[in-house]
């Protein structure tokens, strides 16, 4: 199941931009529901979604390239408000009869925008910074459009036709590097397109509960695996709100957990929801399946497959205590929108890696999936959790991958290596919390390079220990991320404690890679 809201969407047409999903998120931040569709969508397919407006995303192509994705002119004749961004701005111009030129001047990064009036930039400084990323530029606006901004390399950096409810900008209003970008996007949606801002956490929760009731039916029973994270907790809380005690939550202790995690789930979630919880100990089964497995994708698949097998065993146990003839047909998953995107869930997207909530399920899975969060971003999930009354200890928890520490050990997963990583992870989390840094870090994976040995000096002799990698990142939604600039004294305390207290570790290193190009998790 995925959320099909009672809201007509703003459709973000994806031209291959890394920020297409971020645009959709910004539209929702403006209080309006949005979805992403591929640029290959036909006018008929667009009409079937009954949208209220279109936003054309950026993309890497030139409108003059032989295989450049364009926009069907018939789409622009549907009578919908249209907003073009970067490449979408140029494609829109081209389709409407304006001119796009290869000026030979490129603009990448922060750029001065010169405002010449109009609705989009009304009240903003006449010269302010925006984030540009383009080679070609619009040299002449289509007939009926007013040029409202320019830059050094883009004579037409923004235009609008208020009567036709169409506008566009050459820069990227969706990124934080364009300080007034959210205001500009909201102006288009509300003042030019005339849309109502009615997308809130309260109505998201209400609609989700109703959709779950429709899918599961009046007698259907569901099972939900709790990981201890916010996604599974909110998904379970929604389903329980919808079907009550026909939901059984199962916490699989697969041995890949962080220190104290099992106890936290058994205490915090049950106290907050009163849900039925069954805990099963499957540590040996998972370690047996992972024995000798070192390839990251193989590990993910093995963990996903064994998780379902563990679930089936748990279901059998639940059914033993149920009325004769009862079955459990529905499996609740906390899949999020970025999960689907990263797993190649849309046309034109590359399959980066098999996501732990999407691609690891075996073909013979016996459950019908209930995925109430599938079209939500992380901030929306937290908002729904608060709306449902879940405590901050759950909704504010940093993300943790479904495969757990299994994908934070580079190499074979063994009990000894898990204990090493678990100890190092606890030290890092304890020090970050003590320093008051939890609020600025999206998450901080701690990674054990188990197949690497580095030379060190500890005590009176040389050692050959494993390196530990700290990967603190800051992000809004996990689609893009930057490494967090932690205070040196905090890094020093973490490093000193890990090398002093964790056996067989003699080096701590800091990962300073952004996403892209690197993903947040190492595997």
From Swiss-Prot:
InterPro entries: Class_I_gatase-like (IPR029062), GATASE (IPR017926), GMP_synth_C (IPR001674), GMP_synth_GATase (IPR004739), GMP_synthase (IPR022955), GMPS_ATP_PPase_dom (IPR025777), NAD/GMP_synthase (IPR022310), Rossmann-like_a/b/a_fold (IPR014729). One of its GO terms (cellular component) is cytosol. Keywords: ATP-binding, Glutamine amidotransferase, GMP biosynthesis, Ligase, Nucleotide-binding, Purine biosynthesis. The active site is at residues 86, 172, 174. ATP binds at residues 227-233. It holds the Pfam family NAD_synthase. Pathway: Purine metabolism; GMP biosynthesis; GMP from XMP (L-Gln route): step 1/1. GO terms for molecular function: ATP binding; GMP synthase activity. Disulfide bonds: none annotated. Its EC number is 6.3.5.2. Catalyzes the synthesis of GMP from XMP. Homodimer. This is GMP synthase [glutamine-hydrolyzing]. It comes from Corynebacterium efficiens (strain DSM 44549 / YS-314 / AJ 12310 / JCM 11189 / NBRC 100395). The gene is guaA.
